[in-house]
Amino acid sequence: MLHCMARPIPAEVIFNPNWWYRSFGISFEESFYFDRRLRIQNDLQMRRALYERFRLGAPNPGPRPIVGSEHVAGGFVRPALFGCKILFEANAAPNPIPRDLGAEEVLALTVPDIANTWPMNQLIADLESLQNEFGCVCGDFDLDGVLNTALQIRGQQFFLDFYEAPQLAHHVLSVVTEAQIAVGTYMRARTGTLSLSTNRSTINVDPSIFLHSNCSVQMVSPHVYEQFLFPYEKRLAELVRHIVVM
């Protein structure tokens, strides 16, 4: 008889912002993401709460120079780079408002200069301040997915573009992908991680993995995926080493 030693499967628990707000009064307004003092304070409170209530994590966590929370997900950075207005609420994740750009506006899109475009310019300045104060920086932020961001730029018309304006669709996907590569390579160089704010499970495998949100992929057919999205996912995989969340 063959006896096998079962290996434990690591699991991580992520709670909705509304749970944090109702249970501990943590607000997810803009300051949660951009006030570094408040962010460090909230991170400490959240880690203590998880241990005290569920015995998850360390019993006596200390403050750390974190740039993005690993306890909630919210892919607003890349849509914001393309000019999407972001709705912040006390008890919800950030909500990018689609721009619904016209065809000419879409074709004029270029890859943003991340060092000089909000919110990356603000986050980069934050990184520098944390680096100077603590000597290191940890964490990252949810970078969203290729199709997700394309929809936030173009709106639901983007689904029709696959059939009516394929060149336009490819242009949007190309620009979005290059922006994702720019932000991803920058973040990995600064903190060593890319996806803790998307799915903390990566810490149990390889924290440098690029695992991104791609919720909307299930809304397109396999044929559309192969023809339009796969080439850009493949480029991300080759340059940033990533896994897709579907």
Task: Please report, for each region that a protein language model flagged, where it lies by residue.
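A gly/proline- and charged-residue-enriched helix-loop-helix capping module
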Residues: 90-125
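A generic structural signal for short, solvent-exposed coil/turn residues
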Residues: 3-5, 59, 89-91, 100, ...
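Intrinsically disordered, low-complexity segments enriched in proline/serine/threonine
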Residues: 19, 67, 81, 98-100
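Aromatic- and acidic-residue-enriched segments that line the glycan-binding/catalytic groove
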Residues: 75-96, 146-157
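An N-terminal, globular interaction/scaffold subdomain
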Residues: 31-82
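Active-site loop segments of alpha/beta catalytic cores
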Residues: 1-39, 45, 62, 66, ...
